[in-house]
Regions:
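Positively charged n-region of N-terminal signal peptides that target proteins for export
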Residues: 1-4
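Bacterial N-terminal signal peptides
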Residues: 7-15
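Sec/Tat signal peptide C-region and signal peptidase I cleavage site
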Residues: 17-24
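A glycine-anchored, Pro-Gly-centered beta-turn/N-cap motif
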Residues: 24-32
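Predominantly extracellular/secreted and cell-surface proteins with exposed
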Residues: 31-129, 133-143, 147, 152-159
């Protein structure tokens, strides 16, 4: 009987630990953080998204594209004038991983002929932090380029 109780306690403990190790975001919360993109004029790049129960919504980040973005006037944040936002939500698994492949993004940079396809892969290391990689491919009148990759660490409520 004693061995049965020990085995039951051990099994229950392992099940609780396994369930607790799956880090999921807080639904309705905003996550924001820096990317490893090059700092331009003192301005860094940021990623931001809203967490749903099993999706990341309004996933956005700055990108200068891969064809080049022109000049960067002093005092102007080039990433804020060149935001990309995914047109669909990014699914989150029960284990806290997330991924979307080659999805279109609305982009405020470039010209109207330039289109972005974005892939995002990452995971939540806790309910308050996620890290991942964003890959951007650009297609326009001059052909296509990419992928340009950047990594990010986003935290609950901000940087």
């Amino acid at each position: 009987m004693r061995k049965l109780m020990i085995a039951l306690a051990l099994t229950t403990t392992l099940a609780v630990v396994a369930a607790a190790s799956a880090a999921l975001p807080h639904p309705g919360a905003r996550y924001t953080g820096p990317t490893n993109s090059k700092v331009v004029n003192g301005f860094g790049n940021t990623v931001t998204f809203l967490a749903g129960a099993r999706t990341l919504k309004r996933f956005s980040f700055g990108t200068l594209g891969c064809f080049g973005y022109g000049t960067f006037p002093v005092g102007v944040d080039p990433y804020s004038t060149s935001l990309a936002q995914l047109t669909k939500s990014v699914p989150v698994t029960a284990k806290g991983t997330f991924a979307v492949t080659s999805t279109p993004a609305n982009w405020s940079g470039g010209d109207s002929d330039t289109k972005l396809k974005v892939s995002v892969v990452g995971s939540f290391s806790s309910a308050t932090a996620a890290k991942g990689t964003i890959s951007v491919t650009e297609t326009g009148a001059n052909g296509s380029c990419g992928p340009v990759k950047m990594t990010f660490i986003a935290k609950l409520g901000g940087q």
